[in-house]
Amino acid sequence: MALRGSHRLEVIFKRCIASPVFHSHAANRRSSQLAIKGTDPSSNGNSGQDQQNGEQKAKGWRRLVRFFVPFSLGAAVSAAVIKREDFTPTIAASKMTGRRRDFNFIADVVAGCADSVVYIEIKDTRHFDYFSGQPITASNGSGFIIEQNGLILTNAHVVINKPHTMVQVRLSDGRTFPATIEDVDQTSDLATLRIQVNNLSVMRLGKSSTLRSGEWVVALGSPLALSNTVTAGVISSTQRASQELGLRNRDINYLQTDAAITFGNSGGPLVNLDGEAIGVNSMKVTAGISFAIPIDYVKVFLERAAEKRKKGSAYKTGYPVKRYMGITMLTLTPDILFELKSRSQNMPSHLTHGVLVWKVIVGSPAHSGGLQPGDIVTHINKKEIKNSSDVYDALADNSKNLDIVILRGVKQMHVTITPEDP
């Protein structure tokens, strides 16, 4: 390949030499050099020595081309990367031809609904960044606009994390606004926010009842705080009961998808190929297993919230009486354990129960104590943990510290956490 590339470069260089422009400049340079030396450029008194010198120069040019041009190309590529904002693609889909036009259906979906997706940050008003002096980001998530006057839908666990926080929303165009919480249903894990701005792009709501397993879907959001991220997959199941996931007090049949969803995607939309939201991204168990709240269930929540607004009953910030640890967790049911063991060789074969930690709030007691996403809690204060209810019961206990036994991969570890009082 290297020889073939060098040969092509030589051909290109020879063509350049053959061009009139090259010869005109070359002739001018030769005339100038000969004039300086006091030699007549039209003289034909050159000998065989001159011909030999010309051949040596030609060989030198070839070596120079082989060495210099690849580095020139590399420099050009580097310059293109550095100045990539100057070359943002602006080709409309209607101007594309061939397969790009016929098969890029995911791009068509994104073009129609991405502007309505927002990035949500939860700021801790008690802790400030050393350099900027601004409140630090305690956690983040996603949401999407459902009314032009600034009403935003998201997950309750995104905005209800702990006391002494404020909510900020960043739109797809980069504008940032403070947000107020309008309504929260912690049982269904849904919430609405309001920002004071009008004429916003709105996400259309579809019907989750018409979904079929195997349908293409697109997940939009801000995983790991990376705004405007797009992933795609299919609906794995339309009827994944909350009891199968070990979620207490929830009577929801979740949508299961293999679209990549991770931390920060929570609250973002799961969209069908018509550009309609058919679910709200809620949780991830492992790669290829994620869940979303069906949009039909969300519509019931929105109707109730609208009735409350008509009656003038505003949402009052209320935090759980239980102590705060700072994790989002999922009960390991037999079905989920089977999926995890089939996908990962690091899962202990003897594991039959526990709670999976899939998110840890930065700066929380769990974070300070060393708990990490992916840890599996099996015991707290020597009591066996079989589901998330057992963890809540442990938090309700008056013990100052929680001695937690976890599985991290195949290793069993102990971490000590001191929950915050409400």
Swiss-Prot record:
Q: Where is this region: Disordered?
A: 29-56
Q: Where is the active site?
A: 157 (charge relay system), 189 (charge relay system), 266 (charge relay system)
Q: Which residues form the propeptide?
A: 18-74
Any transmembrane segments, and where? Answer: 64-82
Q: Which residue ranges does the record annotate as region Serine protease? A: 139-302
What Enzyme Commission number(s) appear in the record? 3.4.21.108
Q: Where is this motif: IAP-binding?
A: 75-78, 94-97
This protein's UniProt keywords: Apoptosis, Hydrolase, Membrane, Mitochondrion, Protease, Serine protease, Transit peptide, Transmembrane, Transmembrane helix, Zymogen
Task: Assign the protein's first listed, main location to one coarse class.
Answer: mitochondrion
InterPro entries, sorted = PDZ, PDZ_6, PDZ_sf, Peptidase_S1_PA, Peptidase_S1C
Pfam families assigned to the protein according to its UniProt record, in alphabetical order: PDZ_6, Trypsin_2
What is the topology of this protein in the membrane according to its UniProt annotation?
Answer: Single-pass membrane protein
Q: How does it assemble?
A: Interacts with th/DIAP1 (via BIR 2 domain).
Q: What is the role of this chain?
A: Serine protease that shows proteolytic activity against a non-specific substrate beta-casein. Promotes or induces cell death either by direct binding to and inhibition of BIRC proteins (also called inhibitor of apoptosis proteins, IAPs), leading to an increase in caspase activity, or by a BIRC inhibition-independent, caspase-independent and serine protease activity-dependent mechanism. Can antagonize antiapoptotic activity of th/Diap1 by directly inducing the degradation of th/Diap1.
Q: Under which name does UniProt file this protein?
A: Serine protease HTRA2, mitochondrial
Q: What is the lineage of its organism?
A: Eukaryota, Metazoa, Ecdysozoa, Arthropoda, Hexapoda
